[in-house]
Amino acid sequence: MAGAKSTRTERPSAKGERVRLASVIAPFRADATEDTKPSGRAGKTGRARTTQHQVIPSGAKKARLPEKLFPQLATLVSAAPTTGDWIYEVKFDGYRILTRIKHGKPALFTRRGHDWSSKMPALVEQLRTLGIKSAWLDGEIVVMGKDGVPSFNALQNAFDRARTADIQYFLFDVPFFEGYDLRQVPLRDRRRLLKTLLETRATDKIRFSDDFAGDGTSIFAAACRMKLEGVIAKRADAPYVSRRSKTWLKLKCTQRQEFVIVGFTDRKGERTAPGIGSLLLGVHDDAGKLVFAGSVGTGWSTETAADLKRRLVALEVKHPPFADATKPKSGRWSRRSAVPERWVKPVLVAEISFSEWTPDGQLRHASFEGLRMDKPAQSITRERALEPELAGRKPLRR
């Protein structure tokens, strides 16, 4: 994948970018055409080694496969970068999953290192057919909705209903491969290796996450028009680092993030009523203290509402789960429910979309997207988008 020049004289049209983005989900969409192909940039590997019919790029080092690997995470930014050599991938609406293949046996791990292999036996078996003896692979699992676009709710339902055979696995990186540590190899060359591997061995459930080179603003706009979650911008020359970095940037089409569920209200204010009226939400501040962030009262089905109530009643406590043990107050910019609020142990995490934050730190026009079983409540903080020019000034903590 040859490096793209940072100065471009032609700006691709939003329509053209939508056509190219359509190829990412072409196997699932009826409106995709054969000529919708992503960039597929090939990198110069210099002196390289060959193993298992795969070219190991220059910069790789012989190394033992680690038992655990913390993933590289992206920094939220407000706009696409305007300088540097960047590639763009679809931001899939799913769960981050890393695969360790040891002695030919795959195991699936969440970003926090929990082994989910038993939850997705069909995917484990398909990974086994790749014929890899030793590797760490990085990607995202998704389930496609009826419109052919990744659906977080459909993914959650797949786990809740034990229908994980519907899951697709989009791979986008390979930090370790067949006895080599590739983390210091430039991204473009790691992805070239992964793409070559999957061109001949990909299955109907395991796919390469294609990238797009070009004007990031147009690519992002096209992704939003296609109702995708957003895009990920990655520096083509960057190494793989096990922390949140500023060589991977995420741009979201809507405001959306995880929140800790701190309580709920009953539907119509009746404790015996099925379902719930609203969820009460919180995030951790810079000091690590849990603070109130508002509520959400829409976005769930009758079935989901009943499931949420069963989970929450089992976690109920007498007092609000905040550091000062006081009930949060209504702010000027938000309204609190008139019905009694019931508090719970702050262990469940929900994905919430919303229009904006109010000046007093609460959500407006929020909608429930689903539970996040892959992220611990202690890690949930308010996401703040950086300007892209500021993203590279100093490193972020993990």
List where the protein language model places each region.
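Catalytic cores of nucleic-acid ligases and guanylyltransferases
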Residues: 1-398
